Amino acid sequence: MQEFQSDLELLFTRLSGKVTGEVMLALKPINDRLNLLADRHEVKINHSVMEIICASHLIARGYETEVEREMGESMKCDLSGKRRIKDGNEKIVVEVETGFVPPEEALDPIAYRRTRITSKIARYSMFSDKFALTTPNYHILQIPEVLTLSPKDRDRGELSGLLKECIGYYKNPPISLMELMSCHLDAVYVIWIDDCRVVEMDPSEYLGSYL
């Protein structure tokens, strides 16, 4: 726990030279919450560092931002934010992906990562106006290209194949074909952790650049 706090203190020192005092002030309750969850052994430092850097990016763009927020039955999102826009409020949900693959999936890491990403998009995007994934620049998200298309342009047969693949990994809660047909991925936030830099990319642009 002491090491967790020390790492976050160092991160805040780095951030203080890159963002405004207003952003730093808004990050304090996020820091407090993550330290509390670390006391309970519910979060890990590599994941929390990315949450804070991404939160600083969202806050600087006008979002009131929370971390590790309950969203529904047995669901918790990594980052949630809302801001005023011309037509009302805009809600964003961001999920952090570090690239972790469990030992039991050592022989099929790509399939595991692809179905994990698919599950995240299908399950979480329904709770937001804008849904994004964030990942470090040294990891490549395995985003199915079909999910970067608008719902009307998605091939039903391709989605059915993706659903079948997902069922082998995620059965509780299950993913439906309807969710795959209507879900949305609106942005990818690429994080350079060492210098606390965030670059927002369109999902199609991300796939073209990294895959």
Predicted regions span which residues?
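Accessory terminal regions of nucleic-acid processing enzymes
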Residues: 43-47, 51-53, 77, 207-211
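A short linear hydrophobic-aromatic micro-motif
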Residues: 64-68
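Non-catalytic C-terminal interaction segments of nucleic acid-processing enzymes
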Residues: 2-30, 34-38, 138-211
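Conserved catalytic cores of phosphodiester-cleaving nucleases, focusing on short active-site segments
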Residues: 54, 58, 79-81, 85-107, ...
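Catalytic cores of nucleic-acid endonucleases
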Residues: 97-155
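A short, highly charged nucleic-acid-interacting micro-segment common to nuclease
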Residues: 32-52, 70
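Short phosphate-binding/catalytic loops that engage adenosine nucleotides
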Residues: 62-63, 129
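Beta-rich nucleic-acid/ligand-interaction surfaces
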Residues: 72-78
